[in-house]
Amino acid sequence: MNWIQLLTGDDSDTQGASDRSAYERDYDRIVFSYPFRRLQDKTQVFPLPEQDFVHTRLTHSLEVSSVGRSLGKMAGEEILKKYPELVDIGVSKFDFGAIVSAACLTHDLGNPPFGHTGEDAISDFFSSHPGGKFFRKLVSAEEWQDLVKFEGNAQGFRILTDPKYQGLKLTEPTLAAFTKYPRQSLLNDPIAKRRSQKKFGFYQSEKDKFRELAASLGLKVLHPGAAWCRHPLAFLVEAADDICYHLIDLEDGCRMGLVSEQETTEMFAGLMGDRFISEKLKRIPGKNERIGLLRAVSIGILIDQCATVFLENQPQVLDGSYDQALVDLIPAREVLAEIIDVSIKKLYRSEMVLEIEAGGFEVLGGLLELFTAASYKHLFDRQALSRKEASVFRLLPESVKITLTSETSVYAMLRQILDYVSGLTDRHAVGIYRKLKGTSLAGWR
């Protein structure tokens, strides 16, 4: 792989107008897009937070984007020194920062309601629920794998390339940097040790789009037509996400009283090393302000360390032999492992998280049971359509019904239903579920 092709591909106008680059336009278009705004009411870790200081997917994405911009600019500055031909075609360190920042902004765009539990709930419906298992023989093996392994990354790529969001029209480098897992769901011989093979990044419905993207940017092929090496900047996107959720989840947990201030301070101090000055910290009034300062300094340290690892492994990144998370090789990796262990025990398994996650299975499973059955019978088995199912189908948004009636395959129909359900915010999903179950009706008290 080479940087000139990786940063331009077949895009004819990557520099854009004089006021902003095409990559900066990517960022702006994402910010003003409807799918991005929906992240405001989607779970990060603590579902449906009542406290306004706990992160949602929206605030998390903005913070990851900020960290990604710094990583991109730091890496870009050094890459330009090594490859002056990039300067000759007008590439700057700000272009690296803009690409990574825009890709980071979209990294959670495909996540369903209720966080990662939402992914499990959707997958579980098709793999375990009779209403979902019904579709097994009506789709191909590859399509079935897409359904029983719902993947937010693949859903995000679908959203970013969906014709209904034509206003996005993101550049190829941004789309590729977004794709952390450049492979399809069903792979006969996955390379288990490769980080980029752990999940998948596109559905069968978008397979041709990714294949064209990979060819345009010159991504190295691992499995013809099925799996590729990552775009190098995807490693920086992943690192920005890792940095933010490891540290900011801990900060949120401390604010909510799930982790003590002393334990949180000790872990941040381990990351900061000589830069931790306890006397300075004591002069800051308020727990939230003290923890916020420690988090800010720690993020800066991890940015420097991740950028260094990325640059040290440039040859291996470009030839496709490097395929690890940057945070796994930084000096602070052992302290990060401790933070992850504490987060699993005290945050992700806390009662408030587990209660809402269990509810997420009920809500999403219930919505899918009703909407998939009603849509299938409306399109493919009208005689079997019950009055209740006809009412459920009519409750779908008009835009969804219009799209559904144009579909000719069961897989395409299911993808449209999943687009709708996974795109719901947490509160909207709960509200629709209550109405369909008759526990919340207009005009009733």
What kind of region is each of these model predictions?
Residues 275-327:
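Hard-cation-handling environments
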Residues 25-37, 328-335:
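Acidic, low-complexity proline/glycine-rich segments
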Residues 1-19, 31-42, 51, 62, ...:
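Sequence-structural signature of the catalytic-core scaffold of metal-dependent phosphohydrolases
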Residues 36-40, 131, 165-169, 184-188, ...:
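Intrinsically disordered or highly flexible coil/loop and linker segments, enriched in small
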Residues 55-59:
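Low-complexity, highly charged intrinsically disordered N-terminal segments
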Residues 42-52, 342-347:
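A short small-residue
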